[in-house]
């Protein structure tokens, strides 16, 4: 990558401003002041701005985050804090959520700067399953699991939901696995059968399960196996 492009990404400024900073001798490579933005960087080089190291990124990045309540999954929001607050990573604003959660929903969020990978997570064509832990206002009706297996009619939609698996933990606490991503789908499915979701926590996306060791607001890089599992055929 060219130095000027790298600095533009790292500093979040235009290349014109990067050129000004280079002329001001604020950038060094391996301890030497550089003024040309055309230099091609190599991964082992030590790039610094005002003496502060700038980390070179090799390839796309993938993380799992345990999202707490009160944060939105967009990268910018004028009214609410975003999940980027938790990501102590260079150029964090380049990351986006592969499958968002509502502000009051907690649990697994996948963060990446790989657009094709996130498309495989969210595209209906790939049928990526998601599992949620759901707390309900009322005890579950005996026929709800079968209704979800058959598909339910959501308000103001023509087609039934795809078959979903419902496992009862307690009368008002269940685990739901769906393979779609309709708007507010879990909440609307329970509303369609006369119940209401009180708490919603996502545990799994595809073969990626939220790490039990991650406290709310904590994150970790995905493993090579977890990254490769997205979009892989299930035999």
Swiss-Prot record:
Subunit organization: Monomer.
Enzyme Commission number: 5.4.99.19
Molecular function terms, GO-annotated: 16S rRNA pseudouridine(516) synthase activity; pseudouridine synthase activity; RNA binding
Residue span, S4 RNA-binding domain: 1-68
Keyword Coiled coil (UniProt): no
GO cellular component: cytosol
Protein name: Ribosomal small subunit pseudouridine synthase A
Gene name per UniProt: rsuA
Lineage: Bacteria, Pseudomonadati, Pseudomonadota, Gammaproteobacteria, Enterobacterales
């Amino acid at each position: 990558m060219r130095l000027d492009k790298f600095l533009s990404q790292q500093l979040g400024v235009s290349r014109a401003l990067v050129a000004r900073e280079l002329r001001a001798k604020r950038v060094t490579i391996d301890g030497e002041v550089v003024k040309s933005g055309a230099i091609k960087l190599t991964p082992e080089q030590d790039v610094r701005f005002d003496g502060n190291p700038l980390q070179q990124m090799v390839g796309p990045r993938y993380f799992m985050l345990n999202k707490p309540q009160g944060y939105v999954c967009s990268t910018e929001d004028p009214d609410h804090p975003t999940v980027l607050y938790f990501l102590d990573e260079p150029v964090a604003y380049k990351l986006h959520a592969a499958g968002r959660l509502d502000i009051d929903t907690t649990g697994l969020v996948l963060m990446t700067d790989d657009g094709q990978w996130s498309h495989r997570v969210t595209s209906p064509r790939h049928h990526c399953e998601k599992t949620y832990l759901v707390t309900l206002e009322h005890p579950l009706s005996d026929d709800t699991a079968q209704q979800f297996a058959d598909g339910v009619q959501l308000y103001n939609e023509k087609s039934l939901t795809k078959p979903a698996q419902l496992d009862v933990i307690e009368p008002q606490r269940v685990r739901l696995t769906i393979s779609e991503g309709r708007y507010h789908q879990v909440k609307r499915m329970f509303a369609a059968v006369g119940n209401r979701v009180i708490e919603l926590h996502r545990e799994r996306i595809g073969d990626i399960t939220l790490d039990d060791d991650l406290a709310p607001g904590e994150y970790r890089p995905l493993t090579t196996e977890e990254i490769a599992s997205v979009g892989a055929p299930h035999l």
